[in-house]
Amino acid sequence: MKTLVLLSALVLLAFQVQADPIQNTDEETKTEEQPGEEDQAVSVSFGDPEGSSLQEESLRDLVCYCRKRGCKRREHMNGTCRKGHLLYMLCCR
């Protein structure tokens, strides 16, 4: 079931990326990334509250961010997240 949800989220992300044209304006390239809107920490929980084999120490230390433009170095895309009507990439390390 989790695999189906993850695959459908990836398909939706692919459609979203293809639907939105990439706009590279001078304003976007000159401004530095500012924390806040782009870098939002997300709490990630795996398994049930009583605990499961998925809740190992390495998974509890997982830190994820919702990012607009893609994952940073040492992060990998782990799905998508939504804020309002906008869809972001869920980048975890």
Curated annotation (Swiss-Prot):
It comes from the Eukaryota. GO terms for cellular component: extracellular space. Paneth cells of the small bowel. GO terms for biological process: defense response to bacterium. Keywords: Antibiotic, Antimicrobial, Defensin, Disulfide bond, Secreted, Signal. It is found in: Secreted. Residues 1-19 form the signal peptide. SMART domains: Defensin_propep (SM01418), DEFSN (SM00048). Its main location: secreted. InterPro entries: Alpha-defensin, Alpha-defensin_C, Alpha-defensin_N, Beta/alpha-defensin_C. The keyword Cytoplasm does not apply. Residues 23-56 are annotated as: Disordered. Belongs to the alpha-defensin family. Probably contributes to the antimicrobial barrier function of the small bowel mucosa. This is Alpha-defensin 9. The lineage of its organism: Eukaryota, Metazoa, Chordata, Craniata, Vertebrata. The gene is Defa9.
